[in-house]
Every structure is written in C-alpha cells, then in structure tokens.
C-alpha cells in the first residue's frame, strides 16, 4: 500500500505518458502504414490499369510521379543504356558518329572540362593536367564510348573520355585518372614524360605512364625536354599537348611504343594495353585500331579507335611533332591527340598519316617542326569538337546514323521482339499445285472434248475413254502451263465435270425410286449396248445421259446389294424362330426324332423360298430374274442352313435358358411355346395351328407355320386325350404346388414336360398357362430331371428315343405302369411319365423339397430319385436364375417349358462351360448371328 501511495502519481503519469506516446506512435505507424499500403495499392492498381489501358487521373498522377522518379533514374542512367547500344558491332563505326554527337554535346562540358584540365594542366603539372586535358579532348572525341567501356577497362583515356561524355562524372573519372596520371607523372617526375606518357597514354597514361614511367623513364626526360615544351605548346595549340598526347595516347602508346619505346610496348599491356597494343600494332591501319579496340571494350574501340583513325591520321603528322619534340612516340601521340583535339591540322595531317601505318616508324623519323605547328593551334580544340564530329561522318558517314538512332534510348519503349526469319521462296520456282490444275484442267478440257465426243460418238463407252485420254493430255498441258486453254475450257470443263458427277450421283436416285424395275432392266440391256441410241438426247442434254450410265452400274450394284440384303433378311427371319424351335426340339429329340428333323429340313427349304419371294418383291421390285435367282440361291442356302442351324442353335438357346432363361425364353420359347401350346391345344382344341402361325408368321412367314404343322402331325395323334387329362391333373397339382415354390417348382414342372413330351406330346406343352404355378411345383422335378436328361442325353440317347417314341404314341397312360416298372432304371425313369415315378422322384427330391403329389401328374418320368440330389444342387445354383424366369413365366407361360426342355437337355453338360458365354450371346449377340457362327 505504501508503495502504491508513494509511487501512484509517478506510475500514473508514466502510464499516461507511455499511453500517450504509444498512442501517438501507433497512430503514426497506422497512418504511415495505411498511406504506404494505399500508395502501394494505388501503384499496383495503376500498373494493372496501364496494362489494361485504363488510367486513373488522381491515383495515377500521384503514382506516376513516384514511378517517373523511378523511371527518371534509368533516364539518368541513360549513359548505361548507351553502352547497350554500343555492344552491337555496328556501333563500332556508329559509335564515332554517336560519340561525335556526344562530343558535340560534350565539348560543352568536355571541352570546358578539357579546357579546365588544359588550363589546370597549364597552371598545374603541365604534363599531368595536359594529359587530363588531352584526355578530355580525347574523351571528347570518343567521349561516350570511352566513358563506359574504357573506364572499366581502365584505359583511363577512354574512361576519362567517357566521363567527358557526362562531364561531371567524366571530370571525376578524368580527374581520378589524371591523379593516377599525376602519380605516374610524378613517378617519371618528368613533366614531359608525364605529359608525353600521359598524353601518349591518355588515360592509357596509366597504362603507358605506369609502363612508360617504368619502361620510359629515360625517354621521358628527353621527351620532357623536347616534348614538355612542345607538349605544352601543343596543349596550348591543341588545348593541351598532353591533351593531344593523352587524347591520342593510344596512338602515342603505339607510336611511343615504336618511338618512346617500344619500351612503352609494355605500357600497352597496361590497363587497356590490349586496345593500345592493338592500336600500337594496328596504328598503321587506324581502322584496324578501331576494329580491334572494340574487343577490349567497344567504348575503347570507339573512342580510342576513332581517335586512332583520326588521331592515327593525325599521328602521321603528329609523329613528326613527336620527333620534333625529341620523343617521336610521345610527340606523335601528341599530334595525334592534337589532331583529335584540333581536327583542322590533324585532319590534314591525318590524311597523310591516317593511311600511313608507319606511325610507329614515323615517330622516330617524324619531323619535329610539325609539332609546334600543331602545338600552336589551340583553337582546334573546339575545332576538334567540330572536326571530330565532321571527321566521324567522314570516316563513319555510313554508320553514323544508326548510332544516332540508337542513342535516344527510351526506357519505356517496348523491347524489340526478335523477328522471325521466314525463308523467301520463289513462287516461280515452285511447281503449280498439280491437284488444282489437274482438276481444273480435267474439268476444263473434259467438257469441250466431251461435248465434241458426245455428238460424234453414239456410245457412252467411247466417250468416256476419249475423255480420259484427253484428260491425260490436259494434264500435260497443265504441266506446260497453258492458262488460256484452261480459261477457255473452264466453263465447258465445269459442265463436263458436272456431267461426270451427275452421271454418277444425282440421276441414280430418281432411277432407283421411280424407275427401279423397268429402268434397271433397260439399263442392263443398255449396259451391254451402252445405250447407243440414248446418247444423242444426252448430247442434247449433257447431264442426264451420264446419270443413265450411272444408273446402269448403280442400279446393278444396288440390285446386287439389295439381293444380298434380301438374302440375308429372309435368312435372318428364317433362322431365329425355326432354329430355336428346331434346335431345342431336335436336341431334345435328336435320337428319337431324327426323322421329324429331316421333315423340318425338307419343309423349311420350300418355305424359305416362299418367304424369300415374299421378302424379295418388297426389297427388289426392280428385277424379277434377280429376285428369282436370289430366291433360288436362298432356297439352296436355306436348305444347307436348316440342318446346321437346327443342330448348333439349340445349344445356345438351351444354354441361354440355363444361364439366362429370361432372354432365351423370349426368343426360343416364342416358337417353342407356340409349338407347346399348339401341341397341347391341338391335342385338346387343335389350336396349335392358329397360335403357331401368329408367332411363326411374325418371325417365320412360311416355315414355322409348316414346321409346327409337321411336328403336330407327328406328335398330335398320340398326346391329345392323355395330354388333356394329364394337363388337367397337372393343372390341379400345379395349382396346389404354386403356393410352395415358384421358381424351383417352375423349373421342375418344365423339365418333365420337356423330357417326356419334347417331340412327342404337345399336350404337356399346352398347359403352360398353368405352367406358371407348375414351375413352382416343378422346381424339385426340374432339379432332378435335368440331370437325368443330361445323363440320358449323353449316354442314353437310345433309351430316350424309345421313351419319346412311346410318348409320341400316347402310351404315357398305358406306360405309367411300364414306366413304374422301368422306374428302377434312370433312363426309363426319365422317359416314363407315370405319376408313380413322379411320386418316387418327389420323395427322393422331397428330402429337401415338398410335396410329392404335384410330380406324379407330369414329371413322373422326368423325376428320377438318383438325379434328385444333383437337381437339389442345381436348385441351389439355379434359384438366382429362377427370378428371371418368373417374369418370363408371367409374360410367356409356354416358353419356360420348352426352354426348360432345352435347359434340361443342355444345362447339366453345358452350364459349367457355356452358361456365361450363352448369357453373353443372349444379351449381346443376336441368336441369328450365333446360329450363323455355328453354321460356319
């Protein structure tokens, strides 16, 4: 408490002050942050809008100022961008002109600066400042080029020359280099050496001065003695002898290397010894010096090379000055610089000395008196500016303009996109497109000859070959490039082209539709004759006659295609319905009913011919001879097919019934159920014929109607009465059994009918409407029976045949006792329809399934106790298939019976291998296709 009371005020005041300043600080920070974020957002927004082409006046103006500042910096750095223009080789000659412009501009700064240096050189260390001045002048000449490239290379001359380009920075670099030159100058401690070496070296003075100071200490005194006087006068005349010397320093180095010494040759090896050495080696051809200078640095090559070219030209005149001064190399360098500085005398001298490669040789020989002449004219310094610029156009008149273009670099200007070089191809050399010309020529040339040929020739065949031959000649003419012929024949060619195309495509349609039968015969007759009399009207109307020609071929092709289609269509119509019926029945009664199958085969070929005739006139009203030949061919083909078709297809149907009874039941059961109903009804009401023609006429026009009649004739006499009684009895049983199991019983009810009555009694097939409940009762029987049927079908075909024959004779009632006696044998049990056997089978099967009563009515022969366990297994396996059969039973009651016939005959042997494949055939492949494949 005491602490708080004592310090409460101070604490509160401190907290207040802290909170106050903290608030102020946070407020300030928040404001600044908000402003910065807003500014940044505006900048980014302005940039985005600029990209999109939008502009916000307020934000962008505010932002543009900042951006302009950022952009102004690169504009300030335009000097850096200028070297970008320099690096390309064309800038080498153009740099002179570019530097000349800059020199024109720079002389204001450089000249003043150089004059300052010169004046400084005069009052100060004459040689050093002379070199400074000479360097500015030399810089004035290659100003910009030497600025950037030379300064880094540290040919101080070039580097300093670059500073003159930017007079301030150049002054600094120039001053720094003169400082270097000064120590170098001080190192020789010879004004003449410094002036000469610095002049000779220029900014190379570091190179030459360092090298010349070390290598030329002795010549420097002599050079000092003679040159200093001359150099200063030259400095006076050129603005600075050192300026002349330093400005041509490369030339001086070159010449001093020869004169001053080839001692100075090590000096060229100095900071920019390479350009100078190259210049030294190349001073003879100053253009070479220009070319070589770019290698060390384009600015060097530009400034130095320019000076070399001009100063080298000046060097020849300056070399005598060097000689006059006593150091030919240095003196020559001075004159070169002087020429660079003073373009009047230097240019005059440069002409003799420019071409004179003996710059190095001339420095020793060079006349000294010319030096004072150049030393005297100081005004040429401005002349140098003017002269340097005119000299540049004189030397670089060709390349001056591109540099001028390059110099005004716009940072905002979009970067030039690289141009894609597209190879130019001579159109004349290329061959004309043969396809177009050929087509045009064929069209052009065909119509005229076609028009000529058609009136002349009466046969279309003659006109066509003539057209082709002429088209070939037309192609040759196309290659020759006869445009007049094409133009002249263009209209007729179009007509001829239409004649050809119209002959083929347009007319055949009307002929097909309107004149199918008659024109087809006429066209066939004319096909041999080629419609000779028809051609003249074709000549009158060119397009229609070719259509008639096209009609011959196309109608014939269409007739052939229609015939093929007709043949295929009736075959497809015949195959699906009769095959399933015949197949299922034939395989169910293969051994027992070989003769009925043969009768079917006999009946079918005649009917397919009728069906073919019925189908052909609709499809082929065009020609009767073709329809007859096609119908005969179909008959022969169908005669060959039915036997093969009957045997293989029942397997797929049975298999399909076994695997998917639903699909196969619809396809197979339709005819089979018709047979079943026809048989049962024929036995009872003789309705099988009426029912069969319905389904069979829908599927098979003539066969099925006759085939079921043949089957009924064979089977009907035996079953009628017993079938009715058994059907009634089985109907009651099945009605009772319906409550127990639908799917399993349905299967069981179907197989007994299939086994005993497969080909014998249609009476058992007649109850299919009651069969719906029957399959429920029949499931047990079906499970038992199909195994027995499979055993019998596999190894006991003869017994089955005998049983079926007995059943066909309606011995079922009579045979009930016999069948019971025969019940001990599985074969007899399968064939015996006795209800006692059925009871036994139900008892054997009823171990798992009830009741015993329903089986005795129908499935007694089919239900065999030994096979029952397998059928129980089958029941376990088949119930998933049974639900599919239930809807089928609802839709087609008679079908499941016959399907189970085929199912009972084939399932046991073919379920394992063929069920999935059969399902696939049922669902995907049409049954007709399957039969055809089997036939194949």
From Swiss-Prot:
Coiled-coil stretches: none
Modified residues (Phosphothreonine): 718, 850
InterPro entries: Aim3
Biased composition annotated in UniProt, kind: Basic and acidic residues: 69-84, 475-489, 513-528, 598-615, 738-748
Membrane topology label: Peripheral membrane protein
Pfam families named in the record: AIM3
Composition bias, Pro residues: 366-382, 851-868
Compositionally biased intervals (Low complexity): 93-105, 130-152, 245-267, 306-315, 622-632, 656-665
Subcellular location, record wording: Membrane raft
Chain positions found as Phosphoserine: 57-58, 64, 463
GO biological process, one term: barbed-end actin filament capping
An annotated GO cellular component: membrane raft
Record carries keyword Phosphoprotein: yes
Polar residues: compositionally biased ranges: 166-244, 341-354, 453-462, 752-763
Skewed-composition ranges (Acidic residues): 59-68
Keyword terms, alphabetized: Membrane, Phosphoprotein
Region (Disordered): 1-315, 341-795, 818-893, 908-936
Biased composition (Basic residues): 36-54, 877-888
Subunit note: Interacts with RVS167.
Family stated for the protein in its record: Belongs to the AIM3 family.
Protein name per the record: Altered inheritance of mitochondria protein 3
Gene: AIM3
